[in-house]
């Protein structure tokens, strides 16, 4: 894991097209802004994990329903 130190208003680059800017720090919370092309998905980790779980559930549900139709 790369660990960087940034101050409010400072930016880091991820590749050529994604920027992450520190917008503010209040207590133990850090506000960041992410600027990325539309084709790059940006999610909080808990949202990403929920999306993945839903995809896996839908795929599993779809597979079982299609096999039921074949019987």
UniProtKB/Swiss-Prot annotation:
Keywords: Activator, Cytoplasm, Repressor, RNA-binding, Translation regulation. It is found in: Cytoplasm. HAMAP family: CsrA. GO terms for molecular function: mRNA 5'-UTR binding. Gene3D superfamilies: Translational regulator CsrA (2.60.40.4380). Belongs to the CsrA/RsmA family. A key translational regulator that binds mRNA to regulate translation initiation and/or mRNA stability. Mediates global changes in gene expression, shifting from rapid growth to stress survival by linking envelope stress, the stringent response and the catabolite repression systems. Usually binds in the 5'-UTR; binding at or near the Shine-Dalgarno sequence prevents ribosome-binding, repressing translation, binding elsewhere in the 5'-UTR can activate translation and/or stabilize the mRNA. Its function is antagonized by small RNA(s). This is Translational regulator CsrA. One of its GO terms (cellular component) is cytosol. Homodimer; the beta-strands of each monomer intercalate to form a hydrophobic core, while the alpha-helices form wings that extend away from the core. The keyword Phosphoprotein does not apply. InterPro entries: CsrA, CsrA_sf. It holds the Pfam family CsrA. Disulfide bonds: none annotated.
């Amino acid at each position: 894991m790369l660990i960087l130190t940034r101050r409010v208003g400072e930016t880091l680059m991820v590749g050529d097209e994604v920027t992450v800017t520190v917008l503010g720090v209040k207590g133990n919370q850090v506000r960041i802004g992410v600027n990325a092309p539309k084709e790059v998905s940006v999610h909080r980790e808990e949202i990403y994990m929920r999306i993945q779980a839903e995809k896996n559930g839908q795929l599993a549900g779809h597979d079982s329903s299609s096999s039921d139709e074949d019987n």
